């Protein structure tokens, strides 16, 4: 769901969405000034626990200080299906600043049917806000999002206990204990994870003059926790440029725009790149780069950008491919991976599987079917097992050693793994 990001000389506001990173362009465009370190964060958690409301509350609170543009719940949840069902389906990108950092914030879907979209969003985060409804406690997707956060490599979590205005004070301590136990169970330091207690809906209705403990004061505390508890990430700016493609659209007479988060390296306007994947393009020039509606002379690892590719048609670039420095990565169909298979209690399968099993593999932004071949020592792999096995994908996909992936079957997350060897 993307509308135009780049335009001709028209005084028109344009919006790019990965469901929606708002990127506007007018006849006179501003340049993005890097005055603060850039960090990618996001909201994860069970459906209806308040992720999108919290995202809106953060922008509302910070907008009164000139550090954000307020985005309402309706502006964040834009698609007709989302509006009709009142849930987030894809992952929304917005921006805001604290006193010391520039944040790109990804609001991830919590509904089970859209976990696959959450995987792509979570894989871009340097840290995440796990939103848990204090009256309800941790639920099915709370656990699944924690597991997926670990598997896609999110290094740090912050917990926001939401809806405190409707919570039983005697039960809040139990809910916090349950969440800490879940975090510890799945590889995070539950004892040391910071918790912020608040009510996002209350914060949305308040002003600075009427701020209360669970309202705006809780949002202020949350932003301070992000600044101090989410480590500044190391950016691989010295490696060859690589950006997984999230969304693609075309501008008549100008070319095709591909959007995504830069995984490594830097890119300057005018440089040539390659498109690697199902429809490879050996070389194409980048004639424009933007981030959150502002022009960039160059982009670097960690930034969510749109790249204007000269002369390409929209159908020549696909989600799941990568844009890279020419000659630095190839598309492959076969690899070995060290993989963990989730148990039923973790949201996985009830039964194991054997050679010939064909689930979906989520690798970067790609979603591709692959056939699993177990080693001769194993006739079957069971839930809870860890094993290295071979995967053969049905279409060429850009792969990297130590690259992470998730395995899905229907509405189940089957497992997750790390690529150990590329075989072709």
Swiss-Prot record:
Keyword list, A-Z: Elongation factor, GTP-binding, Mitochondrion, Nucleotide-binding, Protein biosynthesis, Transit peptide
Residues annotated to bind GTP: 45-52, 107-111, 162-165
All copies of domain tr-type G, residue ranges: 36-234
An example Gene Ontology molecular-function term: GTP binding
Region (G2): 86-90
Gene Ontology annotations of biological process type: mitochondrial translational elongation; translational elongation
Subcellular localization(s) per the UniProt record: Mitochondrion
Gene3D superfamilies: P-loop containing nucleotide triphosphate hydrolases, Translation factors
Domain of life: Eukaryota
Region named G4: 162-165
GO CC terms: mitochondrion; phagocytic vesicle
PROSITE patterns per the UniProt record, alphabetical: G_TR_1 (PS00301), G_TR_2 (PS51722)
Main location: mitochondrion
Functional note: This protein promotes the GTP-dependent binding of aminoacyl-tRNA to the A-site of ribosomes during protein biosynthesis.
Record-given protein name: Elongation factor Tu, mitochondrial
Organism annotation: Dictyostelium discoideum
Gene behind this protein: tufm
């Amino acid at each position: 769901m993307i509308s135009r990001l780049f335009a001709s000389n028209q005084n028109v506001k344009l919006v790019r969405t990965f469901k929606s990173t708002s990127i506007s362009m007018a006849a006179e465009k501003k340049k993005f000034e890097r005055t603060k370190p850039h960090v990618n964060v996001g909201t994860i958690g069970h459906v209806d626990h308040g992720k999108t409301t919290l995202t809106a509350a953060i922008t509302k609170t910070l907008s009164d200080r000139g550090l954000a543009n307020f985005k309402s719940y309706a502006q964040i949840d834009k698609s007709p299906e989302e509006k009709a069902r009142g849930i987030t389906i894809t992952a929304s990108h917005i921006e805001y600043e604290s006193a010391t950092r520039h944040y790109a914030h990804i609001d991830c879907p919590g509904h089970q049917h859209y976990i696959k979209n959450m995987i792509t969003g979570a894989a871009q985060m340097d840290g995440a806000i796990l939103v848990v409804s204090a009256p309800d406690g941790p639920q099915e997707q709370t656990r699944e999002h924690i597991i997926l956060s670990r598997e896609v490599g999110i290094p740090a979590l912050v917990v926001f206990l939401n809806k405190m205005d409707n919570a039983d004070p005697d039960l809040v301590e139990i809910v916090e204990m349950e969440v800490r136990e879940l975090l510890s169970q799945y590889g995070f330091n539950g004892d040391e994870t910071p918790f912020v207690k608040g009510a996002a809906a209350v914060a949305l209705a308040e002003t600075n003059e009427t701020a209360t403990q669970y309202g705006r004061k809780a949002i202020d505390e949350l932003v301070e926790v992000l600044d101090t508890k989410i480590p500044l990430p190391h950016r691989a700016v010295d490696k060859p440029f690589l950006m997984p493609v999230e969304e693609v659209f075309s501008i008549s007479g100008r070319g095709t725009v591909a959007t995504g988060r830069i995984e490594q390296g830097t890119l300057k306007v005018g440089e040539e790149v390659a498109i690697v994947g199902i429809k490879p393009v050996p070389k194409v020039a980048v004639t424009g780069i933007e981030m959150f509606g502002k022009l960039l002379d160059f982009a670097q690892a960690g930034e969510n950008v749109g790249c204007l590719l000269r002369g390409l048609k929209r159908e020549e670039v696909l989600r799941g491919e990568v844009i890279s420095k020419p000659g630095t990565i190839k598309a492959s169909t076969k690899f070995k991976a060290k993989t963990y298979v989730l148990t039923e209690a973790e949201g996985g399968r009830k039964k194991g599987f054997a050679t010939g099993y064909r689930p979906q593999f989520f690798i970067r932004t790609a979603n591709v079917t692959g056939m699993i071949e177990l080693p001769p020592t194993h006739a079957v792999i069971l839930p809870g097992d860890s094993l290295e096995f071979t995967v053969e994908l049905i279409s060429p996909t850009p792969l990297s050693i130590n690259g992470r992936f998730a395995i899905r079957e229907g509405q189940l997350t089957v497992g997750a793994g790390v690529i150990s060897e590329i075989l072709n």
